[in-house]
UniProtKB/Swiss-Prot annotation:
Binding of Zn(2+), residues: 69, 71, 217, 305
Alphabetical list of InterPro entries matching this protein: Amidohydro-rel, Deaminase_MtaD/DadD, Metal-dep_hydrolase_composite, Metal_Hydrolase, MTA/SAH_deaminase
Record EC number: 3.5.4.28, 3.5.4.31
Record family assignment: Belongs to the metallo-dependent hydrolases superfamily. MTA/SAH deaminase family.
Cofactor binding remark: Binds 1 zinc ion per subunit.
Source lineage: Bacteria, Pseudomonadati, Thermodesulfobacteriota, Desulfovibrionia, Desulfovibrionales
Protein name: 5-methylthioadenosine/S-adenosylhomocysteine deaminase
GO MF annotation terms: 5'-methylthioadenosine deaminase activity; metal ion binding; S-adenosylhomocysteine deaminase activity
Record's keyword annotation contains Cytoplasm: no
Residues holding substrate: 98, 190, 220, 305
Names of required cofactors: Zn(2+)
Summary of the function given for this chain in its UniProt record: Catalyzes the deamination of 5-methylthioadenosine and S-adenosyl-L-homocysteine into 5-methylthioinosine and S-inosyl-L-homocysteine, respectively. Is also able to deaminate adenosine.
Amino acid sequence: MRPCQTLVHAALIVTQDKERRILENASMAVTDGIVADLGPRHEMITCWQPRHEADFGRCLLLPGLVNAHTHSAMTFLRGLADDMPLMDWLNKRIFPVEQKLTPEIVRLGSLMGYAEMLRTGTTACVDMYIFEKEAMAAADQAGLRCLGGEVVFAFPSAAFPGPEAALEETRALAQKYAGHPRLSIAVNPHSVYTTTPEILAACRDLARELALPLHMHLAETAEETQICLHAHGKRPVACCRSLELLDGPCTLAHVVDVTPDELDFLAQRGAVAVHNISSNMKLASGASPVPAMLERGMPVALGTDGAASNNRLNMFTEMGRAALLHKLTGMDPTLLPAQTVLDMATLGGAAAMHDNRLGSLAVGKAADCVALDLAAPNMQPLYNAVSHLVYAATGMENRMTMIAGEIVYEDGKFTRFDYDALCREMTSIRDFVRRQAGLA
């Protein structure tokens, strides 16, 4: 018998491998944070000698979901500003509070965001915020995978006086996390309309120099397009194209107000689009033309955006809403079938992370997985596992979250931090935010 770190048993394993196999009454062997083998349980128990055994015999095991665009720390703003247009929401509520932030608020807000993700089946995220050093430290503490980086604005933030300092912070973070098994860094210009061509060029140059991906908001609303036309005489995608900003690996959040020609360009560049359906619905920003993206072969992922504009960080919510919205707006019930949406939340997310170890459970891939209880009322009876994951599951069926072979959440308990203490800290943060927003 071969030794392994952990042997995980499940009623079903949705592998998301190239054949999209679903294994019944199966087991997965994990060694050094990597999937060593998968197969029928009765065979695996005769082949592998584990140090630990995790029996989720009535559960469905699937690859951990990837939240491909979020601002994890913004849990501290959840419910602060609802039912407002994007620009009013940003300029009247969000940006003023963010100018008063402290590193500790960002650390705690991020940790709460990661707790929500781990609880609901997300194992990795692409994050962007201020004081991102604290967000990355929180991700390390929680055990999550994270592609993060300091957001770059043309104006001062609470963290830095200007874009030059934010880019230097990006450089420092890239050096700090080089070679880290779970954490990596991207260059994060906020958007075309909150930066300048010179700042975007500096972001491009740093990404090229350090071989980092680029992550930004792009073409989120028609209003953004008008702002860019007024300031630069070009639409947002054209601004990026003229600067060769998207010539390297890039993850683009929203991509709503785009033309067919712009989609052709983005597809040719291999850009990854992130569909943030809940946030776009709540802010009435519009919907990404996802079917048109997929027709062009564009990688498409799903993201929650921040809790201030969603208000959840739950990828099961995003899957269900994405599948339903496009059927409605396209007046076609065959658009975005369940398997396509699950692919977006897993394999598309891996593309957004620029990490081919993620997105599926196969030999040699990262042992990042979650276990959903099939005995939950909303999961009964079971005809089609993928259908249930997209249309029936809520994320609250999750019993276990494993990242790099380590169980970081199981049956209501987080293994790496004190959740009750975190809740007490969030109450203090709420009182601070109320005062800053003039709501106390």
